[in-house]
Amino acid sequence: ILDGENCWEYYPHNGYHFLKQLYSRLVEHPKIQLTTFRDYLKYHNDSTRLPSLVAGSWVYGTFSTWIGDPAKNRAWDLLCKAKDDFDRVMASGRLAPEIAQRAEEQLAICEGSDWFWWFGDYNPAESVADFDQLYRAHLRNLYRFLDEPAPPELEHVISRGGGAQENDGVMRRGQG
């Protein structure tokens, strides 16, 4: 499994040529067989159930980077409402196929986890303001595709930030 975001900006063309060559060589290698989780499990039924699974991530081993802060929770509430509205409109069948496809793509943009990374008081205000405006703009775009009025809450700032400039970036300093 390759992490899809955190190192590629340091490669020319975001790692496109590197990854293309890497995957080509892996495919051609006589002793390596590429697969997906789904395909592997299809042919290997002997798996055992885990008795438990700990929630966590590579950031502090918790989900606190994405949820729990009041601003992050507000952003999730807005996304959940948008998803409910999306589901209702899609179930109605009233959108033309090409508009439905664009709405689905727009929803996928809104569902990206990076939005929630930026919300909260530990990131610098300038960065938070940019991501806040962009996130709300993407949600409004979704409502445009759905031909639904956007909730008035989308006109209000979700998060203001306020952290030190040194926190501006993909990694946060460890605690303790």
What residues fall within each predicted segment?
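Active-site and substrate-binding clefts of carbohydrate-active enzymes
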Residues: 1-176
